[in-house]
Structures are given as structure tokens and as C-alpha cells.
Amino acid sequence: TLMQDIINGRCGWCGTDELYVKYHDEEWGKPVTDDKTLFEFLVLESAQAGLSWITILKKREGYRKAFCNFDAAQVAQMTDEDVERLMHFDGIVKNRLKIKSTITNAKLFLAIQKEFGSFYNYTLSFFPNRNPIINHFQSLSEIPVSSPESEAMSKDMKKRGFKFFGATICYAHLQASGF
């Protein structure tokens, strides 16, 4: 079907929404090595849990504003008062657990940076020979919802205390950031 095939070099899942097409063509699957962008994707992918990606893409600038331009160190310093303020901010999905988890995840993200030198290095540690995997899927039906790498990474992240980052979300995160 139209939504499942790769059409004109573009994955069918992005449909025709201009924002989605721009995201697909300019960002999705491009290798990301800088931790600030990896943190941004982590925040957005976590927020997406149970929702459609386009919902989060449409609120991306709201998330940028709400979460200190995706500065993990600043987000990690946010307080319960900030959570209350964000519960009244229309620019994001107003889910208390997700807002609080973003702050918790920021603290854990910083701990991983300290332990591994960068979140990028941490991510690479789950891949054979520390190299991203290049897939050549032809249709949506071929794409799995997780991978051995996303299973291992999400299990480790869960053990560390990360929230809203299971194997499926982790796989989407890895795909989006070029792993």
C-alpha cells in the first residue's frame, strides 16, 4: 500500500504532512553524534510514548521552550515548581509523569555522559564493533519494532532509572538518530 512502500526515496510512514516530510528528509536517520541533539531526541521520543510522532513534532518548539532548549544540565536542575508551571503550558503534552521523567532522564543522561564520556559513546557501546547498523528495508512491514541493540540499551537504561524509554521507543530513537 501507499503508506507501506518507499515512494520517491521517502518512507511511506511520513505521509504527506509538510512537517513530517521535512523531518524525514532533513533529520530522520541522519547520523547524530552530538549529545545535545541526542538528548533532544530522547526527550521527544519519550514524550511520544502512547502518542503519534506527528503530535510531538507539532509541539517540538514548545518542548524546546519548556525544557531549556534541550540543555540536559539545565533540565536536570528543574524543580517541582517547574513541573507545576509546565502542567499549564500549552506547548507540550501535559502529562505529569512524562514531565517529571524528562527531569529524571536528564539527570541520568548526565551520569551516563560522565561515565562514558558522552551519550554517543554509551549508545555505540550497544553495537557490534561500535558501528551503527545500516538497514535497507523496502517496506514498512519489514521494519521491526525493536532490535537486539534497542532491547539491550533500553534494558540498561531502565536499570539506570530512565522512564518512558522501552525497547520500541529506544529503537525509534536509534533509527531517528542514525544508528
Placement of each model-derived feature along the sequence:
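HhH-family (HhH-GPD) DNA N-glycosylase catalytic core used in base-excision repair
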Residues: 1-179
